[in-house]
Amino acid sequence: MNYANIKYCDIANGLGVRTSLFVSGCTHHCPGCFNREAWDFDYGMPFTEQTADTLLNSCIPDYIKGLTLLGGEPMEPENQRALLPFLVRFKEKFPKKDIWCYTGYTYETDLLAPDGRAHCEVTDKMLECVDILVDGEFIQDLYDISLKFRGSSNQRVLQIHQPGCPELFPV
């Protein structure tokens, strides 16, 4: 997996101060996407053990609330496979910090369902690591600058207490 960018001390992509990882690769190609260059799976730099260690170290300070995954598309199956070991390490090291994940896929139909478009052999484990999932493709006609943590009104901010039982997260 490649990644397009890392933002340290990010306050735009989740509650609190966070480290945000922008992965490369996305098959949605939403018109109006804010990060078109990250559609290409080969864009950016390889995600290595050193990258993972740097991200983990950036989350050590108490003022860092957690990690945010964006893209590109973190829930593309090939990205899930690369991210899962890192997310497991993150949860082991920081059990009180949260993980936010932005995806153009829809939770119930594309990720949770065994025949979903993005469901693969690691999806269930990946979702166990995610605390807040912002789901749904960006739709330019539904763009609303007043929305917190999402770009279009079709997107939902879901708190995942356990896979299969999401709740809308109050923002």
Question: Language-model segments: what does each one mean?
Answer:
Residues F86-K93, V122-K125, C129:
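Catalytic-core regions built around general acid/base machinery
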Residues A52-I60:
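Short, charged beta->alpha transition segments
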Residues N35-Q50, D62-P77, K96-G116, L127-D141, ...:
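Core AdoMet radical
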Residues M1-F22, P31, N35-D42, F169:
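N-terminal [4Fe-4S]-dependent radical SAM core
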Residues A12, E108, P166:
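Flexible, glycine-rich phosphate/dinucleotide-binding loops
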Residues T48-A52, Q80-L87, D115-V122:
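Charged helix-capping and loop-helix junction motifs
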Residues F86-K91, Y143-V171:
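P-loop/Walker A phosphate-binding loop and immediately adjacent motor/lid segment at beta-alpha junctions
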Residues H28:
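Glycine-centered loop/turn positions within well-structured domains
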